[in-house]
């Protein structure tokens, strides 16, 4: 059977680092308050000339270099983002052009913080279906452009960045010892749409809008939803938490990350945490974390890795893969 195997990874961050001390100059907050409640110590903020597409392009080029490939070797591009450069065309098409790729096809996926999990699942379906052999999957965001910088409960949480994976078709046996994507589980429930949203859009207000979040409500649902979908993914692959080498969660909040891992019985040393470095970068957070952990040698070939995320909608999901 065909498996979608990781061929390369890459990441990109804006030039500007904004620490919690810097944030103290913007809103009424403190480093201690932010760290205790979120685990965040700094975030990267896009500057002039830095956009979702430009960051996505940089991450894509890093992934291609890591894989020893060029854009000519790709069949398709999927970009997960909630902060596109334009309403249309898609950011993926923009990046396709920036890479000099004039064949194949490209499109965006929008599932907010769950976007990268949705995008990897989509790429896997195209590969297993024989539509594409090699897919560039990017998560890229500039959430700093949709924040209310007077709201201390939200503006301290988010940052900008991009990460990418290249998935390619490989032969598998059908066993859970195969390399590549083993299984995935996706969920959504629009009944929660008003708990995390942006108050603008082309067809409603004609404006971009800013982010609003009912933080306590999101936290109340997060751990349960995340652990349920991870357990379903384990069951589908006939593995347990004990078999897992790495949990790579969406980097939203350290308390959510720790709470989910504890409920699942996953040891802290098996959890990749980068929220202190990047803040919440929405769809970019998982590929950024993967780039850090694979880049420093923690994640190695053959490791069993769980990706998980929850975002506005609510949307949530998990992907189990063998690196």
From Swiss-Prot:
Compartments, record wording: Cytoplasm
Catalytic activity: malonyl-[ACP] + acetyl-CoA + H(+) = 3-oxobutanoyl-[ACP] + CO2 + CoA
EC class name: transferase
Tagged with keyword Lipid biosynthesis: yes
GO cellular component, as recorded: cytoplasm
EC number in record: 2.3.1.180
HAMAP family linked: FabH (MF_01815)
Domain statement: The last Arg residue of the ACP-binding site is essential for the weak association between ACP/AcpP and FabH.
Name this protein carries in UniProt: Beta-ketoacyl-[acyl-carrier-protein] synthase III
Name of the gene this protein is made from: fabH
């Amino acid at each position: 059977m065909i498996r979608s195997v990781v061929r390369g990874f890459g990441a990109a961050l804006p030039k500007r680092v904004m620490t919690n001390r810097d944030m103290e100059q913007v809103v009424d907050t403190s480093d201690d308050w932010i760290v205790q409640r979120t685990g965040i110590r700094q975030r990267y903020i896009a500057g002039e000339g830095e956009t979702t597409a430009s960051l996505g392009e940089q991450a894509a080029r890093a992934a291609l270099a890591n894989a020893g490939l060029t854009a000519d070797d790709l069949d398709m591009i999927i970009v997960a983002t909630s902060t596109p450069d334009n309403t249309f065309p898609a950011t993926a098409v923009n990046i396709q052009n920036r890479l000099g790729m004039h064949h194949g096809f490209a499109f965006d996926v929008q599932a907010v913080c769950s976007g990268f999990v949705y995008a990897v699942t989509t790429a896997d379906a195209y590969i297993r279906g024989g539509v594409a052999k090699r897919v560039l999957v990017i998560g890229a965001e500039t959430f700093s452009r949709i924040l209310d910088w007077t709201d201390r409960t939200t503006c301290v949480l988010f940052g900008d960045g991009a990460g990418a994976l290249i998935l390619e078709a490989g032969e598998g046996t059908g066993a859970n010892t195969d390399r590549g994507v083993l299984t995935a589980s996706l969920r959504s429930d629009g009944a929660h749409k008003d708990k995390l949203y942006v108050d603008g859009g082309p067809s409603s207000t004609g404006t971009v809008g800013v982010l609003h979040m009912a933080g306590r409500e999101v936290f109340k649902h997060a751990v349960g939803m995340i652990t349920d979908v991870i357990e379903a993914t384990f069951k589908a692959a006939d593995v347990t938490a004990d078999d897992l080498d790495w949990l790579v969660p969406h980097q939203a909040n350290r308390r959510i990350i720790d709470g989910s891992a504890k409920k699942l019985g996953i040891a802290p040393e098996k959890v990749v945490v980068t929220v202190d470095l990047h803040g919440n970068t929405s769809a970019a957070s998982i590929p950024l974390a993967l780039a850090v952990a694979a880049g420093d040698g923690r994640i190695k070939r053959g490791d069993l890795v769980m990706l998980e995320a929850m975002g506005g909608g609510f949307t949530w999901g998990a992907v189990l893969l063998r690196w």
